[in-house]
Amino acid sequence: MQIFVKTLTGKTITLDVEPSDSIDNVKQKIQDKEGIPPDQQRLIFAGKQLEDGRTLSDYNIQKESTLHLVLRLRGGMQIFVKTLTGKTITLDVEPSDSIDNVKQKIQDKEGIPPDQQRLIFAGKQLEDGRTLSDYNIQKESTLHLVLRLRGGMQIFVKTLTGKTITLDVEPSDSIDNVKQKIQDKEGIPPDQQRLIFAGKQLEDGRTLSDYNIQKESTLHLVLRLRGGN
């Protein structure tokens, strides 16, 4: 059958293909016609980026369908995402991609909704609005994917200045862990933080559930003076 490939310059290329042709194979045909190396090609159909190992029929691409060819910037790179089951997913990304964007790509590959994904790199949980380059994530870096349990919840932390911080936590998170999240958001070292809930100072080794801290609970953050106890 014939399909069309439209480039960003508006040029349309016609290709002779079989439904069983793989995406790599199609990229090879584009290279033969246009001289563009496959690793610089990104093919889009119905808003989805096509993965090399899949076939045209996998994506329901039929005769006279039109694919869109986007050139991968030299900054394009691959990163790896390792799940708790030990499976490793490979993603094609740009340094400028946001974390939301990466979660969307994981959903496209694995079917996991972004709101159930927590991505960790170098021990830090990655925030949706930030980009890969913000976290200095470079080519062939490995991120860790932790599934947010249905028990995932939000809590609030109120500072002495009256500011309220929202945190995504699990009931099983330790107090140290919560202090780490506060440091990630606010830059306050954990050893300067004292967290108070229901009039009690929270101990590092305990968990939120130990203190019966539930969703939308409010903790109070008091700064520990240097040299204070």
Swiss-Prot record:
The record places the cross-link (Glycyl lysine isopeptide (Lys-Gly) (interchain with G-Cter in ubiquitin)) at: K6, K11, K27, K29, K33, K48, K63
Tell me which Pfam families the record gives.
Answer: ubiquitin (PF00240)
Q: Which SUPFAM superfamilies match?
A: Ubiquitin-like
Q: Where is the Ubiquitin-like domain?
A: 1-76, 77-152, 153-228
Positions of the propeptide segment: 229
- List cellular component terms (GO): cytoplasm; nucleus
Q: Which domain of life is it from?
A: Eukaryota
Q: Which UniProt keywords apply?
A: Cytoplasm, Isopeptide bond, Nucleus, Repeat, Ubl conjugation
Where does the UniProt annotation locate this protein? Cytoplasm; Nucleus
Q: Which InterPro entries match?
A: Ubiquitin-like_dom (IPR000626), Ubiquitin-like_domsf (IPR029071), Ubiquitin_CS (IPR019954), Ubiquitin_dom (IPR019956), Ubiquitin_ubiquitin-like (IPR050158)
Cross-link Glycyl lysine isopeptide (Gly-Lys) (interchain with K-? in acceptor proteins): located at?
Answer: G76
Principal location listed in the UniProt entry: cytoplasm
Q: Cite the PANTHER family for this sequence.
A: UBIQUITIN (PTHR10666)
Misc remark for this entry? For the sake of clarity sequence features are annotated only for the first chain, and are not repeated for each of the following chains.
Q: Which family does the UniProt entry place this protein in? A: Belongs to the ubiquitin family.
Function of the molecule? Ubiquitin exists either covalently attached to another protein, or free (unanchored). When covalently bound, it is conjugated to target proteins via an isopeptide bond either as a monomer (monoubiquitin), a polymer linked via different Lys residues of the ubiquitin (polyubiquitin chains) or a linear polymer linked via the initiator Met of the ubiquitin (linear polyubiquitin chains).
**Which protein, by its recorded name, is this?**
Polyubiquitin
Annotated source species: Phytophthora infestans (Potato late blight agent)
Q: What is the lineage of its organism?
A: Eukaryota, Sar, Stramenopiles, Oomycota, Peronosporales
